[in-house]
């Protein structure tokens, strides 16, 4: 099982995607699901457009790190290269959220001409606690979450296309941007392809039957901040090791996901998977610190 997991985790998505054992919803059922959410979400989204704490079309890039300086440096190098080639047409703020890495990482980050804010937690709070606090300090209408062991490997603009989807489809709360051959899991429920007015094609992921999976998740995602704030509080707890069934990854993704997924759906843009997790390093040392 472990070897299969390792192989799967290092496989990149194909074009067209490998849908494997995923289930496709018939168009009539999919329409019922997304129309209901559009009606429910539209007033929430329109209210957020005039919220003075949300700067319209601004993206807050939140980078979570924990004791992996080399991986973080690699990620930042790839982001710098990407933004040097693809100039964003939207306003950005870049926030580093560090979980107790110590002075070496923080001193390096301060010397980098890259971060607009650095949140340096003196101890490891755990991912759910750290991200919950960091999100409250963002001012963008959208949040792009990247974890320190990812890289960006893409040669086209995509941020503007994400905003286009958000502006035109009120059912979409989050866009998943990870390049991994993970679409074919048994619990994937996928809706028919849709398109924006500028021709950006995307599939919609529907919550799994248990309500926990397929939509809300961590790492390499861009989401509406209002989709987060309107879904209640991210549950927090002790920073248990991953062997504990209630570690913070479960709280963040599955427990909060049950609430988030009631109102919001996820988009996967066709041939737009900018972020890769090389999986060439040890598991984050932050679990159970």
Task: Describe the function of each predicted region.
Residues 143:
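Short aromatic/hydrophobic "clamp" motif used to bind/position activated sugar donors
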Residues 68-83:
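Short, well-formed alpha-helical segments that are part of the catalytic scaffolds
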Residues 154-174:
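Conserved donor-nucleotide/metal-binding helix-loop-beta segment in metal-dependent transferases, i.e.
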Residues 173-189:
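Short beta-strand-to-loop element that shapes/binds the nucleotide-sugar donor at the catalytic cleft/hinge
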Residues 122-138:
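Glycine-rich, basic loop-to-helix element that forms the pyrophosphate-binding segment
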